[in-house]
């Protein structure tokens, strides 16, 4: 808060005691909404959040230049706050999303790619593999909220993992992303011409050598693209995270995946439904921009990797 900031200034430089010092402080959320024009000024006093004196003072300070609109950079370094909405930030939600994406990458991509290689190149064609393929395709079409229910039952109810932790969110999103990674990887492997396999086998290469030395490098651009798009899709999911407790208010920045946290999509949902949503409009827009920037970044990486490793024949 501003009081703590003032205390820290004095403790850092005791010579400030007895001096006049100009400092900038954040206005109250209701004052911000009033000056932004998001409140009907024609409403009677009993329906206004601010007293007539405070409203008049705010207008006078705005007109005289004492109060001004500036970009609050603390939104990127501060966690959410209920006691002081003006200091609310995205740091906690951003770190929560970052931890979850790392878990998704570590779990879903290796397992998904390995499963796809086995099913496409090595698994015998029988009724068991047919059932597995049908189930994978069905899982890819399951609504994401079902994975949230599954995660709440298994990871929280049965395994007793911490509620609202990025670890649980990452595991749930990994389950949701796995079918997408498997399907895109198999499609990339199928796109490699059969003549590549036949030529390698004809020159004496084993089945394993053919797959890992010749087929997989050619399929790599499609595999990487599908994996990153799956991660980007998981980044924007909200419904499964609500069911594992990530909608709870958390006023701290997580240091590990085991700490309680929120996520960017959930934070957007909470701010938009807040009773002070008029005040949180700017913060909601900033959170959306950050989320879109992350997704655009992931998709740009996917396009770059595809262009870099693409092989034409």
Q: What residues fall within each predicted segment?
A:
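C-terminal transmembrane helix and the adjacent membrane-cytosol boundary/short C-terminal tail
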Residues: 186, 190, 194, 201, ...
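Glycine-rich helix-loop "coupling/hinge" segments at transmembrane-helix boundaries
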Residues: 232-278
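Transmembrane alpha-helices
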Residues: 184, 193, 207-245
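Generic hydrophobic transmembrane alpha-helix motif, especially the helices
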Residues: 80, 84, 137-173
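Transmembrane-helix boundary motif in ABC transporter permease subunits
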Residues: 104-136, 149, 157, 303-311
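Hydrophobic transmembrane alpha-helices
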Residues: 135-142, 154-155, 170-181, 231-235, ...
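Membrane-topology segments of multi-pass transport proteins
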Residues: 1-86
